[in-house]
A protein has these predicted regions:
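Structural motif corresponding to the intra-repeat A-B loop/turn of tetratricopeptide repeats
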Residues: 49, 83, 121, 154, ...
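Long, contiguous interaction/recruitment modules in multidomain scaffold/adaptor proteins
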Residues: 1-34, 153-176, 412
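Generic helix N-cap/helix-start motif at coil->alpha-helix transitions
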Residues: 3-4, 33-39, 66-73, 103-111, ...
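Alpha-helical segment of the N-proximal tetratricopeptide repeat
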Residues: 32-68, 75, 81-85, 91, ...
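Residue at a conserved register position within TPR or TPR-like alpha-solenoid repeats
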Residues: 46, 80, 118, 151, ...
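TPR-repeat structural position
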Residues: 52-53, 86, 124, 157, ...
């Protein structure tokens, strides 16, 4: 193709137009920047330097100069909430909502921010109402999640379950706590003097259905263990001991780490039908495969009761040699002291020689009992903190096992093991 020389005329013209456009844009940007108050830049500087208190003061000055700036009000409200000044955060967002000229998108944002203010302030009723007003907006997912937390904190399990169903309609992902919501329904149905066994059974069926989505996961094992334990409780209330025993025994296979939570109840099932020796062997075999302090305690005490001192201590020595544990030794000494105190070595004797011999034996027993007591008290001081369960999310420690952490409200964050075993 031939090059046309007249194109050369347009090249300088194009460069000139580009230079003029750039100058106009630059001047406009400078003009807009100069129109911003100095307090605005001070606020940004304080934020960058992590000085929220001074940033708030600077932004308040800007807001006074330009009360129509919604973005600045959102920033102020967020800062107030982060600092825990909930009344001021609520006032900022309510003032935004009171503006008739506020665009719809900003109105939805202000409503969502206000709901978060109420939630953090602990005003759950008002938070619930505020979140419900944004369920049909782009904030639907976080709003439903917040409503779930509210219903959960109020132990309103039916409404929590309905909220989870709504969440599942918005996002396609499993919600593990749904299993526990159904389990809590079952617990409520079985509580009191007149338990509703039908309602409990229906709730556990629903829990089974929810747990199906979690099968093969670690959380799925925990959920199935809890369902089996509650079905055992339901069977006991329904006078079906064989079912109770079967459900408890199933925990040994579906979630072996949780076996210590049902060991005592399972042993009692065997004891009721005169098969305590068989029950002991079941638990002992499980301990050898999945050792834990709580299972050690159950097996040792039952072995001591059924077979006596020597077999129990032989088991204890072997167990503690394989898995050294101060807490295990503390439990062992506690059981021995209890057994010692149940015995009374001093009895009346007509024969003087027998009386002297018995007195000597009693004195030796008392000395050994005092030694046991001293040894146990020394060890117990060092094991008190280790004899706890701990949340792996927030670290909250408790003497009892919880499915939901009392500290951070997370589900299934308590390991069914004592602190000493986790360190």
């Amino acid at each position: 193709m031939d090059f046309e020389p007249w194109w050369l005329i347009f090249l300088p013209l194009l460069f000139a137009l580009g230079w003029i456009a750039a100058r106009v844009d630059f001047r406009q940007m400078l003009s807009e920047t100069r129109s911003l108050p100095n307090s605005y830049f001070k606020g940004l500087n304080f934020l960058l330097n992590e000085e929220p208190d001074r940033a708030i003061d600077a932004f308040i000055e800007v807001a006074k100069l330009d009360p129509e700036t919604s973005e600045l009000h959102f920033a102020l409200g967020s800062l107030f909430r982060r600092r825990g000044e909930m009344e001021r955060a609520i006032r900022v967002h309510q003032s935004l909502l009171s503006r008739a000229d506020l665009p719809q998108a900003d109105r939805e944002s202000a409503q969502h921010e206000l709901a978060q203010d109420f939630l953090k302030a602990g005003m759950l009723d008002r938070a619930e109402q505020a979140f419900e007003q944004v369920l049909d907006t782009r904030f639907a997912v976080p709003a439903v999640r917040a409503l779930i937390r509210i219903y959960e904190s109020e132990h309103d399990w039916p409404r929590a379950i309905e909220a989870v169903k709504r969440l599942r309609a918005l996002i396609d992902e499993p919600v593990p706590q749904l299993v526990h919501y159904q389990c809590e329904r079952a617990v409520s149905a079985m509580a009191g003097k007149s338990p509703d066994l039908t309602a409990a059974s229906e709730a556990l069926d629903a829990a089974d259905h929810a747990a199906a989505a979690l099968r093969g996961q670690a959380r799925g094992q925990a959920s199935e263990a809890r369902i089996a334990m509650l079905r055992a409780q339901l069977s006991r209330l329904d006078n079906k001991p064989e079912r109770e025993r079967a459900y408890l025994a199933s925990v040994l296979t579906i979630a072996p780490e949780y076996a210590s939570l049902i060991a005592g109840d399972l042993l009692e099932c065997y004891r009721r039908v005169g098969q305590q020796a068989e029950g002991l062997e079941v638990l002992r075999a499980h301990y050898l495969r999945y050792p834990s302090l709580d299972m050690f305690n159950v097996v040792f005490r039952e072995l001591r009761a059924q077979q006596g001192y020597k077999p129990a201590w032989a088991f204890a020595r072997e167990a503690l040699r394989a898995h050294p544990s101060l807490l295990g030794l503390d439990r062992l000494l506690e059981a021995e002291l209890a057994a010692y105190e149940d015995q009374n070595p001093i009895v009346d004797a007509a024969d003087g020689a027998n009386r002297v011999a018995q007195a000597n034996t009693a004195a030796a027993d008392i000395a050994s009992g005092a030694d046991l007591s001293l040894l146990r008290s020394l060890i117990h001081k060092h094991t008190q903190r280790l004899d706890r369960y701990a949340c792996r999310v927030c670290g909250f420690e408790a003497r009892h096992f919880y499915w939901q952490c009392p500290g951070c409200n997370s589900w299934e964050t308590y390991e069914p093991r004592r602190l000493e075993e986790m360190k």
